[in-house]
């Protein structure tokens, strides 16, 4: 049997991390078994579905590199198919027209709740032989079995059973002629030959209804696996107050897709004590049997740790392709300065996100108008004038501009003046970067460049002279 899974989001908002994890698990299961992965957009909610949400879902899937083999299919383009199946069910007697008014249904609901009963349709029109005009408004309901039970072997949770007496006759077509979500899903899974439905636990109650419709259609019933929800680190359902919940917001915040995927796969699944997984390892090791039944807690600190790991272990050239977007957001012109791959090497240890990296690299490419006030007050004092003058001259004398030779120039200055390296290094750091923190000074000065470094030292000396004149 060829394994075939699907990810079927509703385009009523962004792709959130819970949906992304479901997509990842479905994708991994298909890839592990050499099967196929289908993307389906469940846009039957015409009022809430938007083109912007569809684009956001596609952007998120593409950024995570969860490529699909079929689709995207859109349910709104398949209404003719759904209605044809409903008409066949009406002919076969597995569905019927219901003419009950909203007022009657509301009264029925209130009476049942007053008795402490679960609200459900009482089947009045199922057994009615009243004549109705062809144009009289009605819905179509599925004639759910009235006895027995539905049992399915959830691939994560084990056997789950529902009594058919708990299930009412589901509306499968509205009065406006549009098919409903639960029915469209069934026909789609049937037509697309889906073998395994992997989705959130909030769909468990839909499953027996969908299985009954499939059986009424003499269609194969797929295997089901329901993934537990994701909570915040406080144990409550994950929401915006816990931080970002949109996949693309994590992109905007400077995370690499590899970090988010690695984090999401471990959010409910494990393989021994292993924490770091390549995509190839995920595909090789993934199984539904190792997915936890319990809710997972989202831990941003752990995700940040993973992101820092990947910034420093992936190829710098690859990381640079993702850094480029953040550089553009900061409006930094990188034509006059180090290559971005070199920047990744320089700042990788110091920066946990690409956004942080982009926001802290401007001095490599652009001159600054003023020094950081605290750093200048502490390190650009009259006592720093001589070390800066000497190191400037030694840097000017370098013919082979390299980090090693820059280091020798700084060391030689300290030796000549018989002072510690900090007496030279800290004023030099503030002079060339404008601030008191940077990567190793020799590689920083080398990356900034000879001409620009000397110009900035002269600017710092001018700052010191002005400071002296005001004393």
From Swiss-Prot:
Which Gene Ontology BP annotations are present? glutamyl-tRNA aminoacylation
- Note the Gene3D superfamilies from the entry: 1.10.10.350, HUPs
The primary site where this protein sits is: cytoplasm
The answer to keyword Iron applying to this record is: no
Nucleotide-binding in keyword set: yes
**One annotated Gene Ontology cellular component of this protein:** cytosol
Pfam families attached to this UniProt entry: Anticodon_2 (PF19269), tRNA-synt_1c (PF00749)
User: Record-annotated residues binding ATP?
Assistant: 240
- Cofactor dependence: Zn(2+)
The record's catalysed reaction(s) read: tRNA(Glu) + L-glutamate + ATP = L-glutamyl-tRNA(Glu) + AMP + diphosphate
Instruction: Spell out the subcellular localization from the entry.
Output: Cytoplasm
User: Which EC number(s) does UniProt give?
Assistant: 6.1.1.17
Q: List the GO molecular function terms.
A: ATP binding; glutamate-tRNA ligase activity; tRNA binding; zinc ion binding
Query: Could you say which residues bind Zn(2+) here?
Result: 98, 100, 125, 127
Purpose of the protein: Catalyzes the attachment of glutamate to tRNA(Glu) in a two-step reaction: glutamate is first activated by ATP to form Glu-AMP and then transferred to the acceptor end of tRNA(Glu).
Q: Which family does it belong to?
A: Belongs to the class-I aminoacyl-tRNA synthetase family. Glutamate--tRNA ligase type 1 subfamily.
- HAMAP family in alphabetical order: Glu_tRNA_synth_type1 (MF_00022)
What is the protein named? Glutamate--tRNA ligase
